[in-house]
Each structure stands twice: as structure tokens, then as C-alpha cells.
């Protein structure tokens, strides 16, 4: 058996040598093939960058132009990178949504179903959209090429070469982040859906026009889309029509390509995005909507253009403690505040108050509201500057609660700022057809609204020379004007009521134009105002017809609605315009008698001042039954509150630092309307040292915030024990209207000297849930009878946790009051937690002593634990709590 030849020696044999040589010679050509293109591209970039320098020298331009061009290029590049970065971050969020939510659970830009329990997540719908997205893309591509492209070419002779060279809608499809369903008990024939739409697409759309190319390589669109299924039917297809619109302007960002990259230049990018947003808003944002009939033969006119559901009147009164923005060299300055008030596409701006951190506007704005719930009132405050206005804070109020409560007068804390409060009075005006609701006032406020449904016109003249009144026939026309006048007019309409003017769209080249648009006007005087209408030609810039219609002619019509064809003046004999005019009166309707007040300001029902007077000497405490005689004389607590409220109509409603009321100078019976609840006696003929207690129940007539008055000098109370019985009785009597008082009885010492042994003091808290802001509001009024830590008293402050949350970021803390055992804080804190979750939590309130670092003084002064599940948070509550070491009440 012959041995096998080894394989190793054959390796260096002849056949392998040429191969090695070939391998050793290969890197040379490859390296040269890679370096040459890179070298060419580098030289091209250098020449491209140096070209502006050469042109500047050749043209004799200054170096300033070079610096300006470089600055603009850097700015464009920065904006471009930022837009690409945001697009990549959005793609990353779509691909890793679960990890992102778990990591950034407490972020601000999370889907709505995380923050609001009534918004449902619909992953099943997203899976269906993903599955059918390729087929939808093919359908949209065919529609664009077959219908949209020919229409664009027909618009102008310069667009005849317009072509969509690429239509690719990408793999990323629209997503529904959450769905909220609204059901109206008053109208059971419709279903309303709010869809949180998010489209972060990788689409690529390219167009070409005369060898000029441009396009889009990415789109971001986010907004709330409302879908209304109305009316519901008893037979197939069970739904009459589908109405779609955005509640607010959607957020839009577009990544341009080709020559359209110029739209990303500084100053132009914001303008281009805003123009596209306005284009979408003109068709799909309230009050504009798209209605698609599902059942054949169904009249969808009222669905396409419905009447407003109401009008909200916003009284922009004042603001306090706004942030300082006009700082110079780090020194504190002032601000020049103004406010922007908006609802949907309706915007108003207040005047500017210069150099004032506590401005007073006293301005009134009126807005029409079309969808409740859905539309919100937005108020943004800015500091006016010459370059760019600084942001001072914002506020967003749900109009659904305002509609229920009719009138809301309250101070609101501003969001997204360090400090600042805004005082608003909101009035909900209902639309009525009753002739008795027609009022005339001289205050400049609206008394009615007029809704004009502009349908169409017929037999319009081609030009003013077609009038048959003989006025223009004698005039001669030039050849150019004759050629223009021979075509049908491109007409539009101008409608004016008072000082407000609207312009319709232009219908090109038609004697019988169809507009089908709606316009709404505020009317100050129905008897004096009229609707002025002009039909104008867009090309000849002349009037084709005029109509002046007094609004008082609508009053005899049924349901204050007039629909007919109107003859145009200064037009052809048979030139008519078809309209439907609807008039509605405005009035603030009162709440039903006996219904509980459950609005956003359920605390405010006054103010109700109850004055208690005591003297140092010569006054004997009345028996307990006499002290409470007037209080308990009525069996109906609501009637007591009503009677007490009537007696203070002439008292100022301001709640900031109220002054004590003057005392009577002589003996006599006390008036029961005002001071029947004193429960104290007065000694005639002696000088009194009054101590006033304000039981402030803020309400619709109270413009001020929830605030306690300053403590006054404390007299001696030899009859302090009966007072302890009087104050709780007053709280219980007023619990029907609102159990949440601003009980500022800080001047009463309810504990005798010996009874304080073993007690740590008391703290007064006012707690309620504000439905408008979806937050729990805690007002720390003050403390009394605290334990001294030094010979000068203590330096107390209050710390609050909303258990079980104990993070440092969620802690609320008042300011420190120096050297006092009865501090008055009057500080408000808000916890933004849904109502359903608040009822499962509790408040941990601790009073502490501020001490320097390393000091051995006492830190804890007392603690209170409040179980919120046992409280009525909508009405609210206000009371004194005894401080204990562990927060639990003493047995």
C-alpha cells in the first residue's frame, strides 16, 4: 500500500505562485479606483465653496456679503439637520414604542390613552391599517395620476408640463394613538369619535415642471380628528352620513427635496409650513368640515353647515405676578404683557400694557363655539419686544364645563411659567329664537348672531355694461376690455355686517356660480344693522350686483329663518342670488333652581362676610343656646345662605386684603341679614377692639382668588369655648351650597391655656378638584397654636405629598414664615392627576420648622394624613386639622 502524498508540499508549488503574484498586484488598481472618485469629489466641493469668494471679489462686493451668505447657509443647514433629527426620532419611536413608553413614561408627548382614562387604545385598528396600507397606496397613486394631475395642468398654461415623476407612500402608515367616544343623551341619533391621528411617513413624492424638480421625502402630521356618524338609521346602511374635521389646527412638518429645499431656509420654512396648515384648515378645521353621505338621497345640508351650539364671552380682566422678561444686566425689570385668546381658527389679541407685572385689561372677546366637548379656550400671554416676543404663560380651559355652569369667574394659574395668575370671567350665551330674548344694549356687546348660507347666483351679467338701466351702454370699450368682457365673469361675494367683512371663494368663468359657503356675524343691534352684499368680478374688478337687506325683516319669519332668492340691485333684470339667513338671539340662561353647583368654580358663591365682634372687658359670654339662636332659627340652610347673600349686594367683591367693616356706634337690635350669626354680645358705650372673621365663599360674583385676609390684633377671649361651637355650625349650615370654604378664622384662639398641653397645633386646608384643569387644588390657608422651637417662636413651612408618590420632584412646599406660631400662607398647589386616580390617594401634609444646617432645633412640628376617598372633591372641603406626630387623629 503506497503512502499518501502530503498536501502541504503542494502548496508552494508552481500553480500557486502566479496566483500570489496576482494577489500582490491587485490592490494597486483597486486603491487607485477608490481614491480618484474621492479626489474628484473633494476638488469639486472645494471649488463649490470657493466660488462665492471668487464671485464676491470679481463683482467687488464687501466681505459683509460673504459673512451674511455663510450665516444664512449655516442657519439653513442647522434647520435641515434639526428636521431630519426629529424625523429619525419619530421613526425610532414608531419602531420601539413599548421601550420608549416604559423609559419615558412621565414625558409630556405621550399618546393620549396614557394620560386620560377615557381615551382607549385601538391596536386592532392599527393592525388593520398596516395590512391594507399597500392597497390604499396604490389607490391613492392611481387617483393622483388620473384625476389630480390633469386638473393641475388645466389650471394654467404654465403648468402644462407638470408631472408626478415619483409617487411612493412608504412603509410607514398613519396610526391611531387613541379613541374617545362621546354620546349625547339629548341626541341619540349620532355617535361622535375623537381619533388621535399620528402620521410619521417615509413617503417620497417628486414632481417636475419644465425640467425643474422638487418634492417631499417625509411628512409628520399630528392632530385630533373628529368623526361624526349622523344620523343613525333603522335600516341599511344604518348610518346616513359621515362628517370628518379637525378640532384644532394639526401640527405639520414636511421634509423638502430638490429645488424645494429652498423652503427650508430661515424665515421661509415657518412661512411654508404655516401656509400648508392654513390650506388644511380652510377645508378640514372647524367650522369647516367634510361630509360624505352614505345613504343615497339624504339631505346633508344641515350636517355640512350646522349652526353654532353657543357663544362664549371672555372677559379678560387682569393678571398678577407675571414673570419678568425685560431684564438688563441681570437686574430685575418689567414686562410688556399682552394676551392672545383663541378658539380653533378664531383669534383675538388684547392691547399691550407697558412695564407692568400686574396688568389690567378689562377687555371682552366673543367666540362662536361649534363642538362641545371638543373645542377649548386657549389663552397665551407674551411680553412684547422689538425682536421676538417672550412667552409669559398659557392657559387651556375646557368649554364643556363652562357650558354647564353658564358663568365662571375665577383666577387661573398660568402653565409653563415660573409665576403668574390670570383673572377671567367666562359667560356661556345660548342661541334662542324667542322674541322676548331680543335685547338692545349700549355696552357694545353682541345681542344676536347672523348665519348666512351663501348658496349660488344665476344670470349674472358678464360686465357692468350689460346692465339694462342704460347707464353704461353709451360708453365705448377698448378692444382689450371687449375681449375680457366677452367671457363669463369670475365672481366672488363680499358680505358685510357692521364692521365685519367676509369674502367668499372665486368661481372662475361662470354666469351661474355656486359657492356653498357659510359666514357667521355678531350682531349688536338687530333693528339698526343690515347685511350688505356685493357680487364682484375678480378680473374686471367691478361690481356685478349689490344687495342691502335689513336684519329686522327676518323677525317675522318662522324660526327666525329666511331662505329665498334675492333680486340683485344694479345688475341684470333676472340676476338672482340664493341665500338662507338664520338669526339667533344671545342670552345667558340661568341654572335650574335647586340644582347643585358642580362647575369648575364650585367653591365661589359669595362672597359672604360674617362678622364676629368681641371686646376685652365688660362683655359676658351668652349661653350656648342663645349664641346659636339666630343660626339655627331656619330649617333650610339654603334659605339662610340666600338671605345672607342678599344683604351684602353693596359690598365689594374684591378678596385681596379686605378692610374691617365699621362698627355701630350705639346700642340697638342687630340686623339679622348681616350680623345675625355673630353669637357675641357688645357692650354699649365702650370702645371696641374688633376681630373680624371672613367666611369667604367665592362665587360667580367674586372676581378675586381664594385668599385669606391678614390676621388682625388678637383680643383676649374669656369666652373662647362657645366660639369653638359656633364656627363648625356655620360650616355645616353652608354645606349645601358648597362645603369648601375659605375659612380664615385665624384670629380666634380656640384653645384655653391648659387645654394646649400635649397638642401640636392646627392647620387649615382647602381642597377641591378642578374639572377645568383636571387637577387637585390644595390651598394652604394657615396654621395656629404651633409648638415653639426657640424663644422667638418658629420658622414654619408646609410640605405636601400626594401619596403614594414621594419623589422629590412631586413634593410641594410653601414659603417659610419667620418667627411666628400662627403663620398665614395663602398658597395654592396643583396636582395634575385624573379624577378617578385622585379618589384612590391621600394627602400627606407636614408642618416643619426651617432650621440652619447643623442646627439641633426641632424639625417636625406636626403632620396630617387626609384620605381623599372619603371626601367629595367636586364640591370641595375646607376645615382645620389637628396636627399629630404620626398624622392620625387623636383618639
Swiss-Prot record:
Transmembrane segments: 33-53, 55-75
Ranges of compositional bias, category Pro residues: 659-670
Subcellular location field: Cell membrane; Endoplasmic reticulum membrane
Pfam families, sorted: C2 (PF00168), SMP_LBD (PF17047)
Positions that bind Ca(2+) 3: 385, 387, 389
Membrane topology: Peripheral membrane protein; Multi-pass membrane protein
Lumenal-side segments: 54
Record-listed Ca(2+) 2 binding positions: 326, 336, 383-385
Annotated SMP-LTD domain residues: 118-295
Bias (Basic and acidic residues): 17-28
UniProt function note: Tethers the endoplasmic reticulum to the cell membrane and promotes the formation of appositions between the endoplasmic reticulum and the cell membrane. Binds glycerophospholipids in a barrel-like domain and may play a role in cellular lipid transport.
Domain notes: The SMP-LTD domain is a barrel-like domain that binds glycerophospholipids in its interior.
Name of protein: Extended synaptotagmin-3
Amino acid at each position: 500500500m503506497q503512502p499518501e502524498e502530503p498536501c502541504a508540499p503542494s502548496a508552494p508549488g508552481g500553480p500557486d505562485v502566479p496566483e500570489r503574484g496576482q494577489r500582490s498586484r491587485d490592490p494597486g488598481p483597486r486603491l487607485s479606483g477608490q481614491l480618484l472618485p474621492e479626489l474628484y469629489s473633494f476638488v469639486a466641493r472645494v471649488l463649490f465653496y470657493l466660488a462665492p469668494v471668487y464671485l464676491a471679489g470679481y463683482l467687488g462686493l464687501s466681505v459683509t456679503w460673504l459673512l451674511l451668505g455663510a450665516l444664512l447657509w449655516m442657519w439653513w443647514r442647522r434647520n435641515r439637520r434639526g428636521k431630519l433629527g426629529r424625523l429619525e426620532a419619530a421613526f425610532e419611536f414608531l419602531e420601539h414604542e413599548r421601550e420608549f413608553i416604559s423609559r419615558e413614561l412621565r414625558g409630556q408627548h405621550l399618546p393620549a390613552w396614557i394620560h386620560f382614562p377615557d381615551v382607549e387604545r385601538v391596536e386592532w385598528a392599527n393592525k388593520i391599517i398596516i395590512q391594507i396600507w399597500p392597497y390604499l397606496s396604490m389607490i391613492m397613486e392611481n387617483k393622483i395620476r388620473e384625476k389630480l394631475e390633469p386638473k393641475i395642468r388645466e389650471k394654467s398654461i404654465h403648468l402644462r408640463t407638470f408631472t408626478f415623476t415619483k409617487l411612493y407612500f412608504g412603509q410607514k402608515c398613519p396610526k391611531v394613538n387613541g379613541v374617545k367616544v362621546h354620546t349625547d343623551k339629548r341626541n341619540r341619533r349620532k355617535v361622535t369619535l375623537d381619533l388621535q391621528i399620528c402620521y410619521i411617513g417615509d413617503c417620497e413624492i417628486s414632481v417636475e415642471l419644465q425640467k425643474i424638480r422638487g418634492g417631499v421625502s417625509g411628512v409628520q402630521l399630528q392632530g385630533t380628528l373628529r368623526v361624526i356618524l349622523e344620523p343613525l338609521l333603522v335600516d341599511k346602511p344604518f348610518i346616513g352620513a359621515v362628517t370628518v374635521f379637525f378640532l384644532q389646527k394639526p401640527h405639520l412638518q414636511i421634509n423638502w427635496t430638490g429645488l424645494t429645499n429652498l423652503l427650508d431656509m430661515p424665515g421661509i420654512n415657518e412661512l411654508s409650513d404655516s401656509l400648508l396648515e392654513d390650506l388644511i384648515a380652510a377645508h378640514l378645521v372647524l367650522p369647516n368640515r367634510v361630509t360624505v353621505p352614505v345613504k343615497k338621497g339624504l339631505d346633508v345640508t344641515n350636517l355640512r353647515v350646522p349652526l353654532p351650539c353657543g357663544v362664549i364671552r371672555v372677559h379678560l380682566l387682569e393678571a398678577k405676578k407675571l414673570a419678568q422678561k425685560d431684564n438688563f444686566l441681570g437686574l430685575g425689570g418689567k414686562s410688556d404683557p399682552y394676551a392672545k385668546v383663541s378658539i380653533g381658527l378664531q383669534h383675538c389679541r388684547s392691547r399691550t400694557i407697558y412695564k407692568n407685572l400686574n396688568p389690567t385689561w378689562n377687555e371682552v372677546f366673543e367666540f362662536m363655539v361649534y363642538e362641545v366637548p371638543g373645542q377649548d379656550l386657549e389663552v397665551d400671554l407674551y411680553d412684547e419686544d422689538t425682536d421676538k416676543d417672550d412667552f409669559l404663560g398659557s392657559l387651556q380651559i375646557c368649554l364643556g364645563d363652562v357650558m354647564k355652569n353658564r358663568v365662571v369667574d375665577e383666577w387661573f394659574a398660568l402653565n409653563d411659567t415660573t409665576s403668574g395668575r390670570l383673572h377671567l370671567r367666562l359667560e356661556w350665551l345660548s342661541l334662542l329664537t324667542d322674541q322676548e330674548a331680543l335685547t338692545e344694549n349700549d355696552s357694545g356687546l353682541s345681542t344676536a348672531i347672523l348665519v348666512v348660507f351663501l348658496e349660488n347666483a344665476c344670470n349674472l351679467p358678464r360686465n357692468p355694461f350689460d346692465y339694462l338701466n342704460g347707464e353704461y351702454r353709451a360708453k365705448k370699450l377698448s378692444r382689450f376690455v371687449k375681449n375680457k368682457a366677452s367671457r363669463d365673469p369670475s365672481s366672488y361675494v363680499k358680505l358685510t355686517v357692521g364692521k365685519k367683512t367676509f369674502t367668499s371663494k372665486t368661481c372662475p368663468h361662470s354666469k351661474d356660480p355656486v359657492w356653498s359657503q357659510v359666514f357667521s356675524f355678531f350682531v349688536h343691534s338687530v333693528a339698526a344693522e343690515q347685511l350688505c352684499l356685493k357680487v364682484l368680478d375678480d378680473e374686471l374688478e367691478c361690481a356685478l350686483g349689490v344687495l342691502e337687506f335689513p336684519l329686522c325683516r327676518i323677525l317675522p319669519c318662522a324660526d327666525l329663518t329666511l331662505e329665498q332668492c334675492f333680486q340683485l340691485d344694479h345688475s341684470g333684470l333676472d340676476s338672482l342670488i340664493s341665500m338662507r339667513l338664520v338669526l339667533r338671539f344671545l342670552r345667558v340662561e340661568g341654572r335650574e333652581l335647586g340644582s347643585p353647583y358642580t362647575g369648575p368654580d364650585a367653591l365661589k358663591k359669595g362672597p359672604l362676610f360674617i362678622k364676629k365682634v368681641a371686646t376685652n372687658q365688660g362683655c359676658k359670654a351668652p349661653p350656648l343656646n342663645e349664641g346659636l339662636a339666630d343660626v339655627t332659627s331656619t330649617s333650610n340652610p339654603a334659605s339662610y345662605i340666600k338671605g345672607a347673600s342678599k344683604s351684602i349686594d353693596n359690598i365689594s367683591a374684591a378678596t385681596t386684603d379686605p378692610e374691617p367693616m365699621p362698627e355701630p356706634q350705639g346700642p340697638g337690635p342687630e340686623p339679622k341679614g348681616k350680623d345675625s350669626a355673630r353669637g357675641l354680645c357688645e357692650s354699649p358705650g365702650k370702645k371696641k377692639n374688633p376681630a373680624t372673621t371672613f367666611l369667604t365663599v367665592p362665587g360667580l360674583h367674586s372676581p378675586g382668588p381664594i385668599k385669606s385676609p391678614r390676621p388682625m390684633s388678637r383680643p383676649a377671649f374669656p369666652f373662647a369655648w362657645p366660639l369653638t361651637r359656633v364656627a363648625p355650625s356655620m360650616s355645616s349650615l353652608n354645606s349645601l351650597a358648597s362645603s369648601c370654604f375659605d375659612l380664615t378664622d385665624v384670629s380666634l384662639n380656640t384653645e384655653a391655656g391648659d387645654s394646649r398641653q400635649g397638642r401640636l397645633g392646627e392647620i387649615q386646608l382647602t381642597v377641591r378638584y378642578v374639572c377645568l384643569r383636571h387637577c387637585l387644588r390644595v390651598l394652604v390657608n394657615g396654621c395656629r397654636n404651633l409648638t415653639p422651637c426657640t424663644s422667638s417662636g418658629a420658622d414654619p413651612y408646609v410640605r405636601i405629598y400626594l401619596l403614594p408618590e414621594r419623589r422629590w420632584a412631586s413634593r410641594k412646599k410653601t414659603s417659610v414664615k419667620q418667627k411666628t406660631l400662627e403663620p398665614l400662607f395663602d398658597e395654592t398647589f396643583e396636582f395634575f392627576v385624573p379624577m378617578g386616580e385622585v379618589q384612590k390617594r391621600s394627602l400627606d401634609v407636614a408642618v416643619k420648622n426651617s432650621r440652619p444646617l447643623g442646627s439641633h432645633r426641632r424639625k417636625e412640628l406636626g403632620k396630617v394624613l387626609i384620605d381623599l376617598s372619603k371626601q367629595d372633591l367636586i364640591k370641595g372641603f375646607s376645615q382645620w386639622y389637628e396636627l399629630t406626630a404620626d398624622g392620625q387623629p387623636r383618639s
